[in-house]
């Protein structure tokens, strides 16, 4: 949902004129690299190249926004952690109270902000989130194979910043 609906919609709301297909086609090399390396930081040079050359976002915007996004913008990590913890609780027939669910959201959000932009840092943070609500941290073994992506939001924000600063149409 976030990848294919929210970010393209966000671009439209802020008036960025990059078509849906052009956005994903232009960003696909960075997305594939992000998926294979599992690291926003490792993907940064390719993301910058894709956003500058394929999406035509000025370098001034991408050189400022993308490095910050690679280290701070961990929305994928936050969503992944919250969904993974709730999935693991349901898988193990653990009923979570509303307070526990709110605690999961709060802890996942804070943990994602503090997560390093290195491969699989989110898994370590996931153990902390699981432990914070009294669940077994070793349950991460079930979700280990599906850990990944934040690059798309970094590119979308870069285009929005360039548009708001009147650097692009």
Segments and roles (model prediction):
Residues 4, 8, 13, 70, ...:
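Generic detector of bulky aromatic hydrophobic side chains
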Residues 1-73:
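Membrane-embedded translocation segments of transport machinery
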Residues 2-6, 73-76, 80, 111, ...:
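Alpha-helical transmembrane segments of multipass membrane proteins
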């Amino acid at each position: 949902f976030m990848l294919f609906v929210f970010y393209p919609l966000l671009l439209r709301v802020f008036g960025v004129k990059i078509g849906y297909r052009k956005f994903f086609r232009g960003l696909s090399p960075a997305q594939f690299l992000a998926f294979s390396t599992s690291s926003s930081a490792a993907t940064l040079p390719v993301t910058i190249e894709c956003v500058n050359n394929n999406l035509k976002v000025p370098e001034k915007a991408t050189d400022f926004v993308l490095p910050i996004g690679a280290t701070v913008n961990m929305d994928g990590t936050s969503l992944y952690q919250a969904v993974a913890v709730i999935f693991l609780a349901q898988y193990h027939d653990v009923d979570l109270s509303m307070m526990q669910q709110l605690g999961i959201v709060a802890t996942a959000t804070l943990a994602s902000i503090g997560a390093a932009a290195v491969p699989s840092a989110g898994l370590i943070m996931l153990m902390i989130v699981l432990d914070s609500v009294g669940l077994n941290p070793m349950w991460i073994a079930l979700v280990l194979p599906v850990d990944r992506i934040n690059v798309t939001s970094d590119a979308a924000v870069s285009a929005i910043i360039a548009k708001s600063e009147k650097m692009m149409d």
